[in-house]
UniProtKB/Swiss-Prot annotation:
Its EC number is 2.2.1.7. Pfam families: DXP_synthase_N, Transket_pyr, Transketolase_C. Mg(2+) binds at D150, N179. It comes from the Bacteria. Belongs to the transketolase family. DXPS subfamily. Catalyzes the acyloin condensation reaction between C atoms 2 and 3 of pyruvate and glyceraldehyde 3-phosphate to yield 1-deoxy-D-xylulose-5-phosphate (DXP). This is 1-deoxy-D-xylulose-5-phosphate synthase. It comes from Chlamydia pneumoniae (Chlamydophila pneumoniae). Thiamine diphosphate binds at H78, G120, H121, A122, A151, A152, N179, E374.
Length: 644
C-alpha cells in the first residue's frame, strides 16, 4: 500500500460519506486508517497503540450513530485519531498532528463540532455524558455515547458517575473499550474483576458447551440455544454472583470482538434505541495491525518521530541519548532504595513514563502502582509516611491537579514528610493544553509546610533527591521531561545534602540580576553573554527553592541591583514571579522588575521552538525585551538572529 492508495478513506469528508460505503467495504477502510496512522506517526510521533486498537470500533460507531447530532465523548481523548480521520480531518492538519500547525492529539472543540470537550485526563467521560443526557429533555435528546477504556474503571470519578446513572435514562449507550491496559498494565481489584469475570477463558468455553447441550434437547433445544445473551449472563454469574454493571442500573451486552466490524454494527443498531441505559463491552487489542506495537503496547503507547527508522537501525552502533530528568530520577531512586531499606514509592499508573520499573523490579514489596487514582495515591502515601516510612509519590504535574485536596488535607495539614516527585513540569509540547505542567507551583505555594524546589542539572537533582529523605516536612521536587544537563556551573557531590531555602549564585555581575528556575539557568547564562556585547554585566542566580525562598540572599543582592529579571517555565500566576514580586513588596525594595513566564492562558500544542517563541520565552526574544525594557540599547547590533 502506497501513500496514495487510501481510496476509501479519501472518499470520506464526513461521517455521512462513511454511511455510503457497504459493510463489506469497512474492513478495507480499517486497514487504510491503520496505514494512514502508522505513516503519519512515523514522521510526527504520537499515540500509536491505542489508536490502532480502536479503528473498527470507531468505524462502527460512526456508521450506526450520527455525529455531531449524536454525542461521542471519548475518555482521555488520545485514542481519537481514527475519529478525526472520519470527521473531515484527513488533511494536512493530520499530517502534522501534535506538531506546529497540526491537529491536537486529543479531542479539541476548536477543530471540529464532532469534538465536544477538550480532553487529556482519564475518567471524565461518564460524568460529562451523564450531565448532558440527564438534563436534556427527552423530546430533544439525541444519543449520548461515552467511550471509556477499561482502565477508567480504576478511576474514582468513573465509579462516582456509575453510582448516579438513572435506570430510566434512554438513548444512553456506554462503550467499554476493553484492551486490558491503560498505558501500563492495569492494576487493582477492578482490573482483577474484569480479568476474572469478563475475560475468563472458561466463561466462553462453558457458554458454548451449554449451548451445544441445550441444542440437543428434543423440540425445545433450538429455541433455548438462541437465547445466547441470557445463557451467557448465567454463565458469567457463576464467576461473579452480582454482575457489576447491572447492579448499577446498566444493562450489559458483551463481550464483543472489537475488531469484527461486521458484528459490531448490528449489535450497536440493536441497542441504539433501548429505553434504558446500556453498556456495550467491546474487546480490542492495543497496537492491532503492527506487530511490534501489538507485542509491546506499553512501549508503543506513545512513539517519537521516526520510530520505524529506529527499529530498522537496531543493527547499527547505538547512539546513546543523553539521560533525561526522568532517567536520572529512576536511576537515583534505585540508589535510594539501597540506602534506605524502608523507602516506598507510589505512582498512579505511570510506572513506565516516570522510569520506576527499575525500582519496581528491585524492591517489589516497596513499590505501589495504584492505577488511575491520583487522590488515593497521595493519601495512601500519607498513610505510609504516618507509619514512619520514607515515601516518594511519583506523579505528573498535570495529574497532581486531580489530588489537590488530598495534598492539602492528608499531607500538608498533617505535616507528613511525603516527597512529591513531580514529573513533566513545564511545557508538554505535543500533548498540549491538558498536559502542560505549568500550574503546580500556584497551588503548592499556598500549602503551609510545603517545600518546593526544582533542579537545574543532573547533580542538583540527585542532591535534592538524597536531601529530601532528611526533610521533616512535605516536599515537591519538580522536573521536566527533557535531557538533564550533565555539566553544572558549580561542581558538587551528588550526595551533598541541601537545606531548604538556599539559593545559589552562578555568576557575578553588577548591572542586572537574573533569577532563573531550573534548566533556564543555562539560558540565563547565555543571555548574560549576549548582554556583555552591550557592556552590561549580569548576576545570575538559581533560587532552587521557591518555598522557602532565600530572603537573606535576595535581600543582600537587591542592595546592589536595582534591575531584576525572573525567568521560569510556569504560569505567571503563582510561580517564581509571584514569589519574588511578593518578596519585593513585603520588604519594600525599590527595583525595576521584568518577569518572563507563561501567560495566563491555555497554551496549545507545538514544538519547543514554536511554543517558546510564541510566548516570548526563547533566548532571542528575552534578550531583546531586556534591552528594550531597561533601555540598554546603544548602537544597532544583532542579537542572535534578531535585529535590534
Amino acid at each position: 500500500m502506497t501513500s496514495s492508495s487510501c481510496p476509501l478513506l479519501d472518499l470520506i469528508l464526513s461521517p455521512a460519506d462513511l454511511k455510503k460505503l457497504s459493510i463489506s467495504q469497512l474492513p478495507g477502510l480499517a486497514e487504510e486508517i491503520r496505514y494512514r496512522i502508522i505513516s503519519v506517526l512515523s514522521q510526527t510521533g504520537g499515540h500509536l497503540s491505542s489508536n490502532l486498537g480502536i479503528v473498527e470500533l470507531t468505524i462502527a460507531l460512526h456508521y450506526v450513530f450520527s455525529s455531531p447530532k449524536d454525542k461521542f465523548i471519548f475518555d482521555v481523548g488520545h485514542q481519537t485519531y481514527p475519529h478525526k480521520l472520519l470527521t473531515g480531518r484527513n488533511n494536512e492538519g493530520f499530517d502534522h498532528i501534535r506538531n506546529d500547525n497540526g491537529l491536537s492529539g486529543f479531542t479539541n472543540p476548536t477543530e471540529s463540532d464532532h469534538d465536544l470537550f477538550f480532553s487529556g485526563h482519564a475518567g471524565t467521560a461518564l460524568s460529562l455524558a451523564l450531565g448532558m443526557a440527564q438534563t436534556t429533555p427527552l423530546e430533544s435528546r439525541t444519543h449520548v455515547i461515552p467511550i471509556l477504556g477499561d482502565a477508567a474503571f480504576s478511576c474514582g470519578l468513573t465509579l462516582e458517575a456509575l453510582n448516579n446513572i438513572s435506570t430510566d435514562l434512554s438513548k444512553f449507550v456506554v462503550i467499554l473499550n476493553d484492551n486490558n491496559m491503560s498505558i501500563s498494565k492495569n492494576v487493582g481489584a477492578m482490573s482483577r474483576i474484569f480479568s476474572r469475570w469478563l475475560h475468563h477463558p472458561a466463561t466462553n468455553k462453558l457458554t458454548k458447551q451449554v449451548e451445544k447441550w441445550l441444542a440437543k434437547i428434543p423440540r425445545y433445544g433450538d429455541s433455548l440455544a438462541k437465547h445466547s445473551r441470557r445463557l451467557s449472563q448465567c454463565v458469567k454469574n457463576l464467576f461473579c454472583p452480582t454482575p457489576l454493571f447491572e447492579q448499577f442500573g446498566l444493562a450489559y451486552v458483551g463481550p464483543i470482538d472489537g475488531h469484527n466490524v461486521k458484528k459490531l454494527i448490528p449489535i450497536l443498531q440493536s441497542v441504539r434505541n433501548l429505553p434504558f441505559p446500556i453498556l456495550v463491552h467491546v474487546c480490542t487489542t492495543k497496537g492491532k495491525g503492527l506487530d511490534q506495537a501489538q507485542n509491546n503496547p506499553a512501549k508503543y503507547h506513545g512513539v517519537r518521530a521516526n520510530f520505524n527508522k529506529r527499529e530498522s537501525a537496531k543493527h547499527l552502533p547505538a547512539i546513546k541519548p543523553k539521560p533525561s530528568f526522568p532517567d536520572i530520577f529512576g536511576q537515583t531512586l534505585c540508589e535510594l532504595g539501597e540506602v534506605s531499606s524502608r523507602l516506598h514509592v507510589v505512582t498512579p499508573a505511570m510506572s513506565i513514563g516516570s522510569r520506576l520499573e527499575g525500582f519496581k523490579q528491585k524492591f517489589p514489596e516497596r513499590f505501589f502502582d495504584v492505577g488511575i487514582a491520583e487522590g488515593h495515591a497521595v493519601t495512601f502515601s500519607a498513610g505510609i509516611a504516618k507509619a514512619g516510612n520514607p515515601v516518594i509519590c511519583s506523579i505528573y504535574s498535570t495529574f497532581l491537579h486531580r489530588a489537590l485536596d488530598n495534598v492539602f488535607h492528608d499531607v500538608c495539614m498533617q505535616d507528613l514528610p511525603v516527597i512529591f516527585a513531580i514529573d513533566r513540569a513545564g511545557l508538554a509540547y505535543g500533548d498540549g493544553r491538558s498536559h502542560h505542567g505549568i500550574y503546580d507551583m500556584s497551588f503548592l505555594r499556598a500549602m503551609p509546610q510545603m517545600i518546593i524546589c526544582q533542579p537545574r542539572s543532573q547533580v542538583v537533582f540527585q542532591q535534592l533527591l538524597y536531601s529530601s529523605l532528611h526533610w521533616s516536612s512535605p516536599s515537591a521536587i519538580r522536573y521536566p521531561n527533557i535531557p538533564a544537563p550533565h555539566g553544572d556551573p558549580l561542581t558538587g557531590d551528588p550526595n551533598f545534602l541541601r537545606s531548604p531555602g538556599n539559593a545559589e549564585t552562578l555568576s557575578q555581575g553588577e548591572d542586572v540580576l537574573i533569577i532563573a528556575l531550573g534548566t533556564l539557568c543555562f539560558t540565563a547564562l547565555s543571555i548574560k553573554h549576549q548582554l556583555l556585547a552591550y557592556g552590561i554585566s549580569a548576576t545570575v542566580v538559581d533560587p532552587i527553592f521557591i518555598k522557602p525562598f532565600d530572603n537573606d540572599l535576595f535581600s543582600l543582592l537587591l542592595m546592589s541591583h536595582s534591575k531584576v529579571i525572573t525567568i521560569e517555565e510556569h504560569s505567571i500566576r503563582g510561580g517564581l514571579a509571584s514569589e519574588f514580586n511578593n518578596f519585593v513588596a513585603t520588604f519594600n525594595f525599590k527595583v525595576d522588575i521584568l518577569n518572563f513566564a507563561i501567560p495566563d492562558t491555555f497554551l496549545s500544542h507545538g514544538s519547543k521552538e514554536a511554543l517558546t517563541k510564541s510566548i516570548g520565552l526563547d533566548e532571542s526574544s528575552m534578550t531583546n525585551r531586556i534591552l528594550t525594557h531597561f533601555n540598554f540599547r546603544s548602537k544597532k547590533q544583532t542579537v542572535g538572529d534578531v535585529r535590534v
